[in-house]
Amino acid sequence: MGLVKNLSIGILGTGFMVLATAAQAKAMTLNYDRSIGSPGFGPGQLFVPQGITVDNQGNTYVANGRGVNPDGTPNYNLGDNIEKFSPSGQYIGAIGSGGTGPGQFDEPTTVDFNPVTGDLYAGDVHNNRVNQFDSKGNFIRSFANGDFTGLIPGRFFFGPSGVTFDKTGNVYVGDFNGERILKFTPDGKQIGVIGGKVGTALGETKGVAGVRISPVSGNIFLADQYNNRIQVLDPNGKPLYTFGSTGSGPGQLLQPIGIEVDDQENVYVADSINSRVQVFDKNGKFLTSYGKPALDASGKPVPPPGLTDPPFGNPLDLTPGKFNWTGGTSYKNGKLYVGDFFQGRVQVLNVEGRTQVPEPSSILGLALLGFGAATVTLRKRGQQKPVFSLDKELQKQC
């Protein structure tokens, strides 16, 4: 539990000064609320849910997986759309379809609404572009055609990754293998580039996955996937600091993908291979985590599917809080939406304890200051492209 002290000083009458320090902490917890979608290939069913977003009416939008035939060729009749669900989780319909034409997808990934314009933006991996729709799902345009770096040796991810927006509505899109973030106007004109160097130093990356701009500071938080860390940049793209390290302990990461930042700058990270979501404060202090690996009948973790297998774990473990890798994330109105990568669903979590919690105080001492007295009071309290089953190969990249 993080400890934050605030110091206040006030003059009471003539010569009296009161000093008060208030220690404040965040006792945050994540609790299961419900699931959206089910594993499968029909309407309202999901496979490899990547991008997730929620509109102002509480409807949930999920970027569904890429349909593939047994020989590896695209099957545009499966997935390749954005599934829409009501606030209660009922299937409403789909935006887009499989293909290469206007408004079509060949593997949608990141998806989010522009808070200024209300338009919906979605990454389109194999078509190498971003598709833009209005708030009702009507296609507007595609942009960034061919701007994203393709597949490179040793990696299983490529294309547009996270999408996020600044307070003026400009669009920032991660280029996973380009190790950079591309900046566009709301109508898709490129106006800037952030990053672009591969490596482990501050400001360098190994796979730009999720990207999110803080609604408070405007800082940019990005999931640096193969470096197993989060990088924080200022609004101009200047690197500030990183947090997280390789591993499975509290605050450690194995290939983080999705990332969210709420209105108090709590940072939610989909810690994919660890099959959980972790929460940090804006400085990278670990607060809490939620989720455990899906288990088979013998109690062993269920591995991700093989390259030629259906995109689901075998067996499925749909117990609340069990994941077969975590993927996309979205935060809205006290709830966190987390993609259950290889179990074809989105788990919705209640986020509790985001505010600072006061605790009982005790007077520790009284001292004379000049002609007055000072009372000291201390309150103390005492938290893209799918990955397959090649676990060892992937972890070599960590």
Please tell me what each predicted stretch does.
Residues 42-55, 100-115, 148-167, 200-216, ...:
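Beta-rich, blade/repeat-based domains predominating
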Residues 80-83, 128-131, 179-182, 228-232, ...:
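A short loop-to-beta-strand structural motif that recurs across blades of beta-propeller domains
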Residues 359-377:
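A short, hydrophobic C-terminal helix/tail in secreted or cell-surface proteins
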Residues 374-398:
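C-terminal membrane-anchoring or membrane-association module
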Residues 46, 76-79, 105-106, 127, ...:
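A detector of repeated loop/turn-to-beta-strand junctions in beta-rich toroidal repeat architectures
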Residues 322-355:
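Blade-level signature of beta-propeller repeat domains, shared across WD40, Kelch, NHL, RCC1
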Residues 65-67, 125-126, 176, 225, ...:
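Short loop/turn segments immediately following the C-termini of beta-strands
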Residues 59-61, 119-121, 170-172, 219-221, ...:
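Conserved beta-propeller blade signature
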